[in-house]
Swiss-Prot record:
The lineage of its organism: Viruses, Riboviria, Orthornavirae, Negarnaviricota, Polyploviricotina. Coiled coil: none annotated. It comes from Influenza A virus (strain A/Equine/London/1416/1973 H7N7). Residues 286-483 form the RdRp catalytic domain. This is RNA-directed RNA polymerase catalytic subunit. GO terms for biological process: DNA-templated transcription; symbiont-mediated suppression of host gene expression; symbiont-mediated suppression of host mRNA transcription via inhibition of RNA polymerase II activity; viral RNA genome replication; viral transcription.
């Protein structure tokens, strides 16, 4: 029988049908090759938006800089970055007037954070520009390299472990005449292999000392490395994102902490909360506008889009905002917070890897590094690239481009949200002094504007006033891409509002399925995703039950662990059948060992091992979870692990799941080919840290481990702990006198070695 699909929707409210419009099947696009072109686009565009500003030259590094602040007022609708200082300050003052004490209190809270934050805060984060090696590294390695170089250049405040003291070193490093760094390099030589008698290339990794003069060091400290943003859907062109070095990161962290504290107190801010909390907060603003637009008023909502938000923001504007926000605070605090915007107004964008050329006829490939773009003959390039290079040339120094205006993606999300909210705040009747008024929501560059007025002319006037006010602070609302509708239907940060936020379950579809970490984690993540979607995304019981069955099926196919009594033949079926036959309580077998599935929608919160524990054979239990079984991995597993799940749209989300260490929680070994590359030095450093941390954990089991508050080093802490433990063990008779004496002797030797060093 044919079913008319429209019948399916007869009983469904229109807004619930949004999941059927899901556009994102298949893999998102990834970028290949170099990001140099995209970065040049960003730099050139940013300068174009501010082209009527004043040019100056940075006296320290000789970089040309463009300052659009207080530039000409816009005469057309083209995007521009000419923010007016007095307008920004006025918006800040009004924000403070409507929220008495907001800046004062946020400053006090931030001051407390600044005093307490430890340097290891900077190890969070993924790729970071490592200025010592002039390329990207994991954050922890980049921080360690920076501290190592600082210490070898007599900058030692950081030894206290406080982030604030590390930043003192950063400030001091900028005044030094030169900095000595250690770089890794690669030597290649051809040698004859004894076994095969063939010639092979042998690579050795060396470390060499290099001196950077003040100018070179400053350029590196102010450099943002650029990469291409991957996995962006719905765009034809890729775009560049930036990753700053360790000198900038600490200062940015404190500014963002302050801005975060302010955002938490603003009802129009979509940051820093997320998920259901965010929906509730936003729904309040909408409710307020709808109840206030009594029968006499019209209410319209704009689903807003800003043109090139980051490229029209300006660090100098942020400096003005911070100066105002912290105006009654102690001098040291104001100085620390003003450093991030100052460094950003002197930033340099690293152009990345450069261009790859290949000659089809001669089968040759050659890399033109970014450093050569300043001098190379342009006849080799196509027209569009030629134009880009010509435009960027005056800005180049050592393969980096001077980029004073603009913010680069994702650096000051919180602070720019404060700026956006301050304009929304000006929509109150007491400021507009007319019949229209507005309010709205702001989350970084995304906004929704709700305008109320007695008639359509009033709505139009309100929108125009908002548009012009934004222009004065460097925010460019796009008239082409923004959409106005009666209040009650709009979209904000991928949340769709129709008389309440609609659960767009299809957005979560890509996160269903088998993650591919290991059998244990995958089972746990799979059921947690289903559970979370029942809680947050209107996933109904019948659909959830179906999702669960599909997941189990998918899981069995992925790990070839079909039930022991199945007819399906796979590589593992022989072993699993044998296990099935010799197991008395077959329900006790995990799904990954060919057991049946006991999950249903009521028990998704229980890890599978716990669910089946009472049903397991004793000897199976003993193999599965025995800490003495070499295949049971206990090192890496905490009781709660976190996985990264990818929704279809928006950032990857971190999701927590319960983890139980069993023979199935294996960790894949690292690819060995890294050992032959110049990354090897990095790997050795990483292993050294791992060993130190493991040793430290032996001395301080997690129950007694508190963050060190004093300024003792790890070694001192371990030595004093060893002495205390030894004394207790000796006095309680757990160790003999000779052993006690030997421990004390070792401790003294270690201290002696430290003194000599």
């Amino acid at each position: 029988m044919d079913v008319n699909p429209t019948l399916l929707f007869l009983k469904v409210p229109a807004q619930n049908a949004i999941s059927t419009t899901f556009p994102y099947t298949g893999d998102p696009p990834y970028s290949h090759g170099t990001g140099t072109g995209y970065t040049m686009d960003t730099v050139n565009r940013t300068h174009q938006y501010s082209e009527k500003g004043k040019w100056t030259t940075n006296t320290e590094i000789g970089a040309p800089q463009l300052n659009p602040i207080d530039g000409p007022l816009p005469e057309d609708n083209e995007p521009s970055g000419y923010a007016q200082t007095d307008c920004v300050l006025e918006a800040m003052a009004s924000l403070e007037e409507s929220h008495p004490g907001i800046f004062e209190n946020s400053c006090l809270e931030t001051m407390e954070v600044v005093q307490q934050t430890r340097v290891d805060k900077l190890t969070q984060g993924r790729q970071t520009y490592d200025w010592t090696l002039n390329r990207n590294q994991p954050a922890a390695t980049a921080l360690a390299n920076t501290i190592e170089v600082f210490r070898s250049n007599d900058l030692t405040s950081n030894e206290s472990g406080r982030l604030m003291d590390f930043l003192k070193d950063v400030m001091e490093s900028m005044n030094k005449e030169e900095m000595e760094i250690t770089t890794h390099f690669q030597r290649k030589r051809r040698v004859r292999d004894n076994m095969t008698k063939k010639m092979v290339t042998q690579r050795t990794i060396g470390k060499k000392k290099q001196r950077l003069n003040r100018k070179s060091y400053l350029i590196r400290a102010l450099t943002l490395n650029t990469m291409t943003k991957d996995a962006e859907r719905g765009k034809l062109k890729r775009r560049a994102i930036a990753t700053p070095g360790m000198q900038i990161r600490g200062f940015v962290y404190f500014v963002e902490t302050l801005a975060r504290r302010i955002c938490e107190k603003l009802e129009q801010s979509g940051l820093p909360v997320g998920g259901n909390e965010k929906k509730a907060k936003l729904a309040n603003v909408v409710r307020k506008m709808m109840t206030n637009s009594q029968d006499t008023e019209l209410s319209f909502t704009i689903t807003g889009d800003n043109t090139k938000w980051n490229e029209n923001q300006n660090p100098r504007m942020f400096l003005a905002m911070i100066t105002y926000i912290t105006r009654n605070q102690p001098e040291w605090f104001r100085n620390v917070l003003s450093l991030a915007p100052i460094m950003f107004s002197n930033k340099m964008a690293r152009l990345g890897k450069g261009y790859m050329f290949e000659s089809k006829s001669m089968k040759l490939r050659t890399q033109i590094p970014a450093e050569m773009l300043a001098s190379i003959d342009l006849k080799y390039f196509n027209d569009s690239t030629k134009k880009k290079i010509e435009k960027i040339r005056p800005l180049l120094i050592d393969g980096t481009a001077s980029l004073s205006p603009g913010m680069m993606m994702g650096m000051f999300n919180m602070l720019s949200t404060v700026l956006g909210v301050s304009i929304l705040n000006l929509g109150q009747r007491k400021y507009t002094k007319t019949t229209y008024w507005w309010d709205g929501l702001q989350s970084s560059d995304d906004f929704a504007l709700i305008v109320n007025a007695p008639n359509h002319e009033g709505i139009q006037a309100g929108v125009d006033r908002f548009y012009r006010t934004c222009k004065l602070v460097g925010i460019n609302m796009s008239k082409k891409k923004s959409y106005i509708n009666r209040t009650g239907t709009f979209e904000f940060t991928s949340f769709f509002y129709r008389y309440g936020f609609v659960a767009n379950f299809s957005m979560e579809l890509p996160s269903f399925g088998v993650s591919g970490i290991n059998e244990s984690a995958d089972m746990s993540i799979g059921v947690t995703v289903i559970k979370n979607n029942m809680i947050n995304n209107d996933l109904g019981p019948a659909t959830a039950q179906m999702a669960l069955q599909l997941f189990i099926k998918d899981y069995r196919y992925t790990y070839r662990c079909h039930r022991g009594d199945t007819q399906i033949q796979t590589r593992r079926s022989f072993e699993l059948k044998k296990l099935w036959e010799q197991t008395r309580s077959k329900t006790g077998l995990l799904v990954s060992d060919g057991g049946p599935n006991l999950y249903n929608i009521r028990n998704l919160h229980i890890p599978e091992v716990c669910l089946k524990w009472r049903l397991m054979d004793e000897d199976y239990k003993g193999r599965l979870c025995n800490p003495l079984n070499p295949f049971v991995s206990h090192k890496e597993i905490e009781s709660v692990n976190s996985a990264v799940v990818m929704p279809a749209h928006g950032p990857a989300k971190s999701m927590e799941y319960d983890a139980v260490a069993t023979t199935h929680s294996w960790i894949p070994k690292r690819n060995r080919s890294i050992l032959n590359t110049s990354q090897r030095g990095v790997l050795e450093d990483e292993q050294m840290y791992q060993k130190c941390c493991n040793l430290f954990e032996k001395f301080f089991p997690s129950s007694s481990y508190r963050r060190p508050v004093g300024i003792s080093s790890m070694v001192e802490a371990m030595v004093s702990r060893a002495r205390i433990d030894a004394r207790i063990d000796f006095e309680s008779g757990r160790i003999k006198k000779e052993e006690f004496a030997e421990i004390m002797k070792i401790c003294s030797t270690i201290e002696e070695l430290r003194r000599q060093k």
